[in-house]
């Protein structure tokens, strides 16, 4: 427990962290009276005297939880095979059985647990809930503070491979002046953060909490980035424009114009006069909403109902998440081309062990908006610089024409040739290069010293 005297937590600089080989690193420099919090503890019940403290965090799940998981996996009651030769009915039986066979026999959760525990992880209480986060400081004195937000069915694991390139660019083909300090929180209800006990934790509220987090860490100025829900939250922060937020970067932008959204919602043909890129975006989104959006409808309307099965069956949870890995990676429906089995199972197992199937789905219920539509996301209200990278495997490829209309303060737009919805996870080096380029103009703004 922490003493009554507020103590400062110091994260080791990135120079001492061999991320490239994901080795176990040196211990954190922490006050002797601080004890690490484990994942087994109730992160919704921090003592009152820790209301604004920043506490070290370590993951440790009881071995009984892992034994229970393996027993459930091995006892799966499998259904019959799909009646089509493709993925049009969902995850194919043979694909899921191959993944689950590995999960139940050879997969080792302890590897990723050790990898995460080698990172400087912390927890702090904001707006009544504990927020867990990774915080890695660069050894470069003028590093730009960068807040990164994950989405669903992702987690902080999406960004582990980017920490080295972002914080220590000279070892990864970059320049010293491209360095970032990196802050990667788990959203409320996700991973190792606390689970909301009341309604109201929508993207706007999360955005406010993230600004509190960055200010609590001592950053006067910073930038924010995200994909999936992370994009929605970055947009929300852009609208809020808290003091010190210099700009945002999103890789799932909300660009669909009102007239196009109306036609799509009505099931009408594409409006006349669309360019080739605009028509391709319209067709991609029409296919998504007509054939692939069932997961979202369930979580928007009945997160509790769908969650019972996901909380009780690890294979049900795996299928629910693997379906999105197959559809949203730049892999042609074969996610193992973009992510390893271990990477996918690390994420699935994190959701299972943290019991976050329902709590993560509740964010959809809280935000029943179309996250692709510019009007729903009120992107025109964003007054700070906005950067956008379009990845070819994203749910839709935002056209430059729509993006400029949606974001009047668009400062950077780039279409890349690989990567999908899980951009940082699939292409960590490319993702890093995009953030370097997107935020480089903001480093020299007069009167905005970046680091504390």
Regions from the PLM with identified roles:
Residues 166-192:
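Conserved alpha/beta-hydrolase
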Residues 204-222:
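Conserved acidic catalytic loop of the alpha/beta-hydrolase fold
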Residues 65-142, 343, 352-355, 359-374:
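Non-catalytic accessory segments flanking enzyme active sites
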Residues 109-111, 174, 187-201, 235:
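Glycine-rich "HGGG/HGxG" loop immediately N-terminal to the catalytic nucleophile
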Residues 152-164:
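The serine-hydrolase catalytic nucleophile loop
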Residues 143-151:
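Short beta-strand element of the alpha/beta-hydrolase
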Residues 165, 169-171, 220-269:
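Conserved hydrolase catalytic core segment
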Residues 290, 298-452:
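C-terminal subdomain of alpha/beta-hydrolase-fold enzymes, centered on the catalytic histidine
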């Amino acid at each position: 427990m922490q003493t009554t005297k507020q103590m400062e937590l110091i994260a080791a600089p990135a120079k001492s962290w061999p991320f490239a080989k994901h080795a176990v690193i040196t211990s954190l420099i922490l006050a002797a009276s601080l004890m690490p919090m484990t994942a087994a503890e109730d992160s919704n019940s921090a003592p009152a005297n820790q209301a604004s403290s920043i506490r070290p965090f370590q993951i440790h799940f009881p071995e009984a939880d892992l034994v229970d998981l393996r027993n459930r996996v091995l006892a799966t009651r499998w259904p019959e095979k799909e009646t089509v030769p493709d993925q049009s009915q969902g995850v194919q039986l043979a694909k899921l059985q191959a993944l689950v066979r590995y999960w139940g026999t050879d997969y080792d959760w302890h590897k990723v647990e050790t990898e995460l525990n080698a990172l400087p992880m912390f927890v702090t209480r904001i707006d009544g809930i504990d927020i867990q986060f990774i915080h890695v400081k660069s050894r470069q004195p003028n590093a730009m503070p960068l807040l990164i937000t994950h989405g669903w069915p992702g987690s902080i694991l999406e960004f582990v491979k980017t920490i080295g390139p972002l914080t220590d660019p000279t070892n990864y083909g970059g320049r010293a002046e491209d360095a970032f300090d990196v802050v990667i929180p788990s959203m409320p209800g996700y991973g190792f953060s606390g689970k909301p006990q009341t309604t109201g934790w929508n993207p706007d509220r999360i955005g406010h909490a993230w600004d509190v987090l960055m200010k609590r860490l001592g950053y006067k100025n910073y930038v924010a980035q995200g994909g999936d829900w992370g994009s929605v939250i970055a947009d929300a922060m852009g609208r809020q424009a808290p003091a010190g937020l210099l700009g945002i970067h999103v890789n799932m932008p909300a660009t669909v114009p009102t007239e196009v959204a109306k036609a799509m919602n009505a099931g009408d043909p594409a409006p006349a006069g669309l360019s080739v890129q605009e028509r391709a975006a319209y067709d991609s989104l029409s296919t998504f909403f007509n054939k692939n959006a069932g997961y979202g409808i369930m979580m928007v309307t009945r997160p509790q109902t769908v969650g019972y099965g996901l909380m009780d069956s690890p294979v049900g949870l795996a299928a629910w998440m693997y379906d999105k890995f197959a559809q949203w990676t730049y892999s042609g429906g074969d996610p193992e081309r973009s992510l390893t089995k271990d990477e996918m199972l690390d994420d699935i197992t994190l959701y299972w062990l943290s019991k976050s199937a329902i709590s993560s789905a509740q964010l959809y219920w809280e935000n029943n908006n179309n996250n692709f539509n510019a009007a729903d996301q009120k992107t025109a209200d964003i007054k700070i610089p906005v950067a956008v990278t379009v990845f070819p495997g994203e749910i839709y490829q935002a056209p430059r024409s729509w993006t400029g209309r949606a974001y009047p303060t668009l400062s950077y737009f780039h279409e890349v040739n690989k990567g999908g919805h899980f951009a940082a996870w699939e292409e960590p080096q490319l993702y890093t290069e995009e953030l370097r380029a997107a935020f480089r103009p903001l480093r020299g703004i007069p009167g905005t010293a970046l680091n504390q």
